[in-house]
Amino acid sequence: MQTPSLSPPDIVAVLPAAGNGSRMQNDRPKQYLTIGNDATGHKTILEHTIDALLRHSRVRRVVVVISPDDAFFHTLAIASDPRICTVTGGRQRADSVLAGLSAVADGAWALVHDAARPCLHQDDLTRLLAIVEQSDVGGILAAPVRDTMKRSTDGFIDRTVERNDLWHALTPQLFPAALLKQCLQRALQDGVAVTDEASALEYCGYRPQIISGRADNIKVTRPEDLALAEFYLTSLQ
């Protein structure tokens, strides 16, 4: 149980945005593609994502982790916001998150969110941030699996997997910054595949909490996701 303190810890968002988004088949990384309409504003995916975070009163700052050759971020209007800073990322997502954590005080909590996940609902974020007062470990947003799940070998079904306890891991994921840094460093040193931040804590023996989140908190990965994200953004207005 979290020890009560006189003041709540700072919440600092870390957005790994150093990927090139090759599956989008575009001339720029997916986070710099423009989506929206007159209601939502015509902005890049990254700007929509940052807006969703900074709209919440508990989020103090956003650390955007960009690639060394990023030619786009500093052309955005949002880049001049004093609550936003950038650091240079690494080869893999975990390396980039570690780089972002270098700009986060150890006493703060790190809210790690996909740069290309712009449809975050404020009520989901509020419920996730509430675990700061309840936990020493942290937790993640996740959506329960609804489809029938199959395990296969060589393209043929082996068996149906029981789905009752299966979840789609989403972001944001929220952890004490010092703990997340320690777990990421250990997992990387041991050669463990870190597919999300929670997996690093799991490797180190911790059990992050699951907060049920909305399934429309999608990550834009393929060209067909653009229209869907734009639709969901409109519904948030």
From Swiss-Prot:
- Per the record's keyword annotation, is Plastid included, yes or no? no
Could you say which residues are annotated as the site Transition state stabilizer? R23, K30
Q: Which UniProt keywords apply?
A: Isoprene biosynthesis, Nucleotidyltransferase, Transferase
BP terms from Gene Ontology = isopentenyl diphosphate biosynthetic process, methylerythritol 4-phosphate pathway
* Matches recorded under InterPro entries: IspD, IspD/TarI, IspD/TarI_cytidylyltransf_bact, Nucleotide-diphossugar_trans
**Which pathway features in its UniProt record?**
Isoprenoid biosynthesis; isopentenyl diphosphate biosynthesis via DXP pathway; isopentenyl diphosphate from 1-deoxy-D-xylulose 5-phosphate: step 2/6
Indicate whether Isomerase appears among the record's keywords.
no
Enzyme's top EC category: transferase
Which PANTHER family does the record associate with it? 2-C-METHYL-D-ERYTHRITOL 4-PHOSPHATE CYTIDYLYLTRANSFERASE, CHLOROPLASTIC
Task: Sum up the protein's function in the record's words.
Answer: Catalyzes the formation of 4-diphosphocytidyl-2-C-methyl-D-erythritol from CTP and 2-C-methyl-D-erythritol 4-phosphate (MEP).
This one is known as: 2-C-methyl-D-erythritol 4-phosphate cytidylyltransferase
Species name: Pectobacterium carotovorum subsp. carotovorum (strain PC1)
